[in-house]
């Protein structure tokens, strides 16, 4: 009897344990492996379609209309907030109805940069795609792969036949001009604790943090010099520099056209009393200036000596930066009666401002840049002077100190100084379960280890985490070279791994719970 009871008890315990374990076990719906080569082609197609839409920061109506039409074509409700962010929700496919909500995110705007010699209207003109092997870039100007390919991957994923739970595709506005869209996003828009931002630009890296940034603008107005007799105009044009992203590429110690402009102006003023007439240096605050054109007024008798001195300065830069291809164009001519010439007092004030600005890596810990500064653009037109300095750091306190310093500098020099924009630093010391899952899928897709990356460039998860403290978020994407320049190039062969890691995470996120 005792043995029989023991046997029955053992069977009952086993069956109960089996039932309990079955209740706890997550059963995924049947899944077929997508054709990632085809999915990649679809993502590139969607990207190039989106790239036909002009979309500089603060001018995104056409981009929103493009996404709205895409959503309505597929029967999905399109929404936008008061700032200009927009999104649509894709219902779960059959068998995935109980999966938790998931957010895919990218930004709509791009940094527009024309190729040397091109005169474009960024509100109307777009780049012409050129594809060669696994590379794609734009002719005439960049295509905006940052973050157009992220948008393209989102659109390709949700229109494919892969299984997934409910997905929100979120498209933020004005990221490149200060992350204003993310800063103005309502917390209710983040309807999931799982978010993947497809705004990365470096293969094999998974963002766990980013530097914060603050952009300062200093400006003033100067009357024109009255006496112009005996003066000639010397125009200096410099192009061909690498330029690049002022966060990602600053650690490469690339030559800035802003630095060259400041050096030449300072030298010519000290040696010849030259006065600046105009400056058009750099294009955007978050790009390393790769070109400049400016003119100075000098005594006609000094013209040849000035030209020789400029050549010597540029030659010295060429020796110091042998990897840069410096193209120069110098010309001398007459000054017209209506031409603007900055007076000596204005010239001194401009130089005092420019020489106090910082460029390049300021502090580095190991191989990681923790503090940096960029100078771009620099402008002087009809006496209106303006310069922007974008400082990045892992430490919010340092950026605030720099802001205080430059605001005080503006007061002391009697020029207008303003904080134009800023975004917070972000770091996630914990690798959350969703991020760990995606990291493993990404490692399998690439076949090598993934780097946990803290970017010197800013990314929008810094704001998303503030809206939802329990958010499990990361950012990654395919390799993009020379972002924020006309030479921007997308590596198409890096796209499949990003798609595979994203899709597999969507298909297995239910294993993490709500």
What are these regions (language model features)?
Residues 249, 254-279, 403, 416, ...:
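Active-site-adjacent substrate-binding region
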């Amino acid at each position: 009897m005792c043995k029989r009871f023991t046997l029955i008890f053992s069977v009952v315990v086993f069956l109960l344990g089996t039932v309990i374990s079955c209740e706890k076990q997550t059963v995924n719906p049947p899944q077929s492996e997508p054709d990632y080569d085809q999915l990649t082609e679809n993502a590139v197609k969607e990207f190039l379609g989106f790239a036909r839409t002009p979309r500089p920061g603060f001018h995104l109506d056409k981009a929103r209309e493009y996404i709205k039409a895409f959503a309505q074509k597929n029967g999905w409700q399109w929404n936008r907030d008061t700032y200009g962010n927009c999104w649509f929700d894709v219902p779960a496919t059959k068998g995935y109805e109980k999966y938790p909500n998931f957010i895919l995110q990218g930004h709509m705007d791009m940094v527009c940069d024309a190729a040397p010699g091109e005169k474009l209207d960024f509100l109307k003109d777009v780049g012409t795609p050129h594809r060669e092997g696994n590379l794609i870039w734009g002719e005439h100007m960049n295509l905006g792969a940052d973050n157009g390919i992220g948008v393209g991957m989102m659109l390709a994923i949700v229109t494919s036949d892969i299984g997934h739970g409910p997905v929100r595709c979120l498209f933020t506005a004005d990221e490149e001009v200060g992350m204003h869209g993310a800063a103005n996003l309502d917390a209710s828009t983040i309807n999931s604790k799982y978010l993947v931002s497809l705004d990365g630009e470096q293969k094999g890296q998974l963002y766990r943090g980013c530097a914060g940034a603050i952009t300062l603008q200093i400006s003033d107005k100067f009357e024109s010099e009255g006496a112009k007799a005996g003066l000639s105009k010397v125009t200096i044009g410099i192009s061909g520099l690498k330029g690049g992203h002022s966060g990602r590429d600053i650690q490469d110690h690339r030559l800035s056209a802003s630095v060259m402009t400041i050096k030449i102006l300072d030298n010519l003023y000290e040696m010849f009393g030259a006065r600046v007439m105009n400056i058009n240096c750099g294009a955007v605050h978050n790009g390393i200036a790769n070109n400049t054109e400016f003119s100075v007024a000098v005594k006609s008798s000094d013209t040849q000596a000035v030209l020789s001195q400029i050549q010597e300065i540029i030659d010295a830069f060429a020796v110091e930066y042998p990897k840069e291809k410096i193209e120069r164009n110098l010309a001398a001519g007459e000054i017209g009666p209506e031409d603007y010439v900055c007076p000596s007092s204005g010239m001194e004030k401009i130089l005092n401002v420019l020489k106090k600005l910082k460029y390049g890596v300021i502090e580095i810990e190991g191989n990681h840049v923790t503090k940096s500064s960029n100078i771009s653009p620099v402008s002087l037109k009809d006496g209106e002077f303006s310069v922007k300095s974008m400082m990045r750091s892992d430490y919010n306190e340092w950026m605030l100190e720099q802001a205080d310093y430059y605001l005080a500098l503006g007061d002391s020099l009697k020029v207008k100084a303003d904080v134009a924009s800023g975004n917070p630093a972000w770091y996630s010391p914990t690798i959350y379960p969703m991020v760990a899952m995606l990291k493993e899928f990404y490692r399998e897709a690439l076949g090598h280890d993934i780097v946990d990356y803290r970017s010197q460039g800013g990314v929008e998860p810094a704001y998303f985490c503030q809206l939802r403290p329990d958010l499990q978020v990361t950012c990654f994407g395919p390799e993009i070279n020379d972002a924020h320049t006309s030479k921007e190039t997308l590596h198409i062969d890096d796209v499949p791994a990003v798609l595979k890691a994203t899709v597999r995470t969507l298909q297995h996120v239910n294993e993490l719970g709500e």
